[in-house]
Regions:
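Conserved nucleotide-sensing/catalytic segment adjacent to the nucleotide-binding pocket
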Residues: 3-65
Length: 136
């Protein structure tokens, strides 16, 4: 899916949806600042990737300023990486954890079904607790 200017419904379970806003591609890859992409958004759930580069700290600083609840799946190794895990040599994971992010490390190689289901379950639990689930 491509980034749009509107939120959309994500079906988490049959006939149970939640409103999300999707940023397709990380702000770092897109050459955009997360705050600019997210201005005027009212969705309570944002799906976004963060590129593992030094200037990703700008996105993390925005997350901290906005007091977002953050769940991270660090794809390590990434889809196109060699089959070796990398250390957090930029300190981004430590920085995210210091602002209360929940972090999991998953392989970006192979079948994504398990990690996608993990994301759906996390979003569902978070959304149910906040009464954000709607019929679809």
């Amino acid at each position: 899916m491509r980034t749009g200017s509107n939120s959309r419904q994500l079906e988490l379970r049959p006939h149970e949806c939640v409103e999300i806003f999707l940023i397709s591609g990380s702000p770092e890859e897109r050459g955009e600042y997360a705050e600019d992409v997210l201005k005027n958004q009212s969705a309570r759930i944002i799906l976004c990737s963060i590129q593992y580069v030094q200037h990703a700290t700008e996105t993390i600083d925005f997350i901290k300023r906005e007091d977002f609840r953050t769940y991270i799946q660090w794809l390590n190794p990434g889809h196109n990486d060699v089959k070796t895990q990398y250390w957090d040599y930029l300190g981004l994971i430590s920085r995210l954890m210091s602002i209360g992010a929940t972090v999991s490390i998953r392989s970006g190689q192979g079948n994504p079904t398990g990690r996608v289901q993990e994301l759906r379950e996390f979003i569902y639990g978070w959304a149910v607790f906040r009464n954000l689930i709607v019929s679809c």
